[in-house]
Amino acid sequence: MKRVLAFICALVAPLPAFALSCLAPSVERSFARADAAEERYVVVHGRLTLDAKALPRGGSGEVQPPEMTQVKAVLLGKSLNLEGFKVPFDQEITLEVACFGPWCGSVQNGLDVLAFVRKEGGAYALDVNPCGGSVFGAPQRSMLRAVKTCMRGGDCTAD
């Protein structure tokens, strides 16, 4: 009887859950990461335009999305300097959309964003991954204030 009960318990026991575990993104952490990077970054507040159909979809079952998909986009807005978001920015950029297993980064077409754009020579690239951190959709005023404070050398610690 004990064996039957143990067998039934084993059958109904929850299977291991697979989930993506990420540190909650913050503009302060993103600024610190970009500031410490060897590459040059530009912080831009603007409108992101892209072909959303070109974005990878998350995987399911045996079908997994590619680890990296490059998508052309346009970012139109203002980049950050010591005075704030003052420098016009109208550039074609490459979204580098990463997938971690079945989870893929995502952005929406036409969305107002705060983006940490990497500059490589004359080209611009934006990392988009499932954990976030390089692009913030519909940024709140507090986020814009925080990144301006970071740029000016003020307190740049996440809450």
Where would I find each of the regions flagged by the language model?
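Positively charged n-region of N-terminal signal peptides that target proteins for export
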Residues: 1-4
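Transition segments tied to proteolytic processing and entry into folded domains
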Residues: 18-159
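Bacterial N-terminal signal peptides
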Residues: 6-16
